[in-house]
């Protein structure tokens, strides 16, 4: 790294120290109002590449070795939902368990995953990786492997199998009723390398973003808990997924075009809040 890791245009800089105040790891020093911010010694090593400094500067005065203001999308306040719209959006989220048989184009799924990838990650590690199982026949094949795992659990760990109603689930599956993957056309799996310290929460957060974004694209989702557990512990399914070495799955969702439309928002139990 060189001194050019951070470049501040003196003609544009307001010398207000906003960039230094917003830097989460404090690698920008600010002597005081009227002075130019500057990179602290060794700061380039500590930078987590979040882009806060470039994003928050009102005059686009700062650029980094890897990021300039021109690389960024301007914030359009007209596109931001207000408080009422945001609450309505979140309240209308439903777990979709009935899907049309039509497949979703790969380009649409990629767009959805790109949106989900805007989710925050611990220390801005950007640790989340994605596996998209697009082939519906492959989804059916993998679903059958989950059923095999359930049969194993019924035999070897009956108490846990009873707790999760696995016997009933398998019985339904054998009769053609898929309550494992709900006959969804696609599955999206969020993964991360085992070395990532916040891998599990990063993947869960990204999948939450994905399910909130999906309806805007005419898509529905449902968390695939049985699939994710089986993918974690059942060797045949782990082998079939063939994740890169050192990478583990931390969550999965079913994705497809909803068969039905919801018309009302059921009330939710009031939040349990403790004030200190």
Sequence positions of predicted segments:
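Acidic, surface-exposed loops and disordered segments
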Residues: 1-276
């Amino acid at each position: 790294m060189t001194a050019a890791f951070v470049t501040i245009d003196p003609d544009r800089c307001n010398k207000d120290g906003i960039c230094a105040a917003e830097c989460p790891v404090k690698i920008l020093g600010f002597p005081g109002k009227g002075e130019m911010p500057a990179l602290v010694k060794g700061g380039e090593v500590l930078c987590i590449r979040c882009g806060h400094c470039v994003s928050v500067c009102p005059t686009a005065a700062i650029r980094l070795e890897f990021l300039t203001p021109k690389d960024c999308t301007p914030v359009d306040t007209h596109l931001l939902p207000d408080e009422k719209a945001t609450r309505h959006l979140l309240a209308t989220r439903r777990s979709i368990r009935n899907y049309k048989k039509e497949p979703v184009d790969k380009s649409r799924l990629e767009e959805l995953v790109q949106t989900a990838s805007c989710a925050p990650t611990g220390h801005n590690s950007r640790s989340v990786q994605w596996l998209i199982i697009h082939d519906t026949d492959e989804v059916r094949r993998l679903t059958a492997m989950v059923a095999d795992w359930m049969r194993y659990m019924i035999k070897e760990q009956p108490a846990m199998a009873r707790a999760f109603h696995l016997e009933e689930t398998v019985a339904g599956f054998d009769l053609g009723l898929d309550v494992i993957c709900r006959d969804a056309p696609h599955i999206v799996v969020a993964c991360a390398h085992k070395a990532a310290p916040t891998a599990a929460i990063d993947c869960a957060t990204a999948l939450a973003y994905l399910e909130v974004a999906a309806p805007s694209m005419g898509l529905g989702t449902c968390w695939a808990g049985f699939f994710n557990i089986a993918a974690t512990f059942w060797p045949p399914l782990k082998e079939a997924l063939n994740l890169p070495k050192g990478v583990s799955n931390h969550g999965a969702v079913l994705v497809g075009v909803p068969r039905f439309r919801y018309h009302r928002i059921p009330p939710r139990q009031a939040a349990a809040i403790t004030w200190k």
